[in-house]
Regions:
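Active-site rim/loop-helix segments in enzyme catalytic domains that contact anionic ligands
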Residues: 1-71, 102-105
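Metal-dependent de-N-acetylase/amidase catalytic core
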Residues: 56-199
Length: 199
């Protein structure tokens, strides 16, 4: 599920003069390409502007996410984490948690993981991190990241940065042993936030 519309993304090079509406269409096209390359079972694009997802008074995003959760019944939900550097990502996470709390206990997934992309969760003890081994299919990872041309050519080398971050996580995770994986991604277990509304 892609929550926001991509209108406000940074741009340069051939995308420099694209309007926000044009960028929205480019980003949708890229998401559809990624779904084909990755052979996703489904791709849902909510098309919500960032300013709305960050506005806690707007019920529409929560209603949409809730409907998707009820229709798909996931066992694990992967979203952004609450310490994400990107404020839109934090907004998405808050709306996802809100929607999860509206599910009855029987409808809820078994686990909620807040994934980290921008940084390395250095503030967490390693044993508390959710580690996801991304050693396999490195070629597919490169292909998926490479689909997002508007960001890469447009001034943000997410492809190189993401793959480099994964490799660095794998190498720096254990200081006194050899690497156990070729790529690691980190997350935060946020299941308690779904189940305990007092948090």
């Amino acid at each position: 599920m892609v929550v926001t519309d991509g209108r406000g993304s940074p741009r340069n090079s051939i995308y420099e003069n694209y309007s926000d509406d044009e960028m929205r269409l480019v980003r949708f096209k890229e998401q559809r390409k990624a779904a084909m390359v990755g052979e996703f079972a489904a791709q849902i694009m909510l098309d919500i502007p960032s300013k709305i997802i960050k506005d806690a008074s707007r019920p529409e995003p929560v209603d949409d996410i809730l409907a998707i959760l009820r229709a798909t019944k996931p066992k694990v939900v992967y979203t952004h984490n609450l310490a994400d550097k990107h404020d839109t990502h934090v907004g998405v996470t808050l709306r996802v948690i809100e929607a999860l709390r509206k599910l009855s206990p029987a409808e809820r997934p078994e686990r909620v993981v807040g994934c980290e992309v921008w940084r390395a969760l250095d503030w967490m003890v390693d044993s508390d991190k959710v580690t996801m081994d991304l050693s396999r299919h490195e070629n597919l990872q490169f292909a998926l990241l490479g689909v997002f041309d508007s960001q890469i050519v447009g001034g943000k080398r997410y492809d190189l940065a993401s793959m480099g971050r994964r490799r660095a996580n794998a190498t720096y995770f254990e200081s006194h042993g050899v690497d156990d994986s070729q790529g690691l991604s980190y997350g935060v277990d946020m299941t308690a936030l779904m189940n305990d509304p007092s948090l």
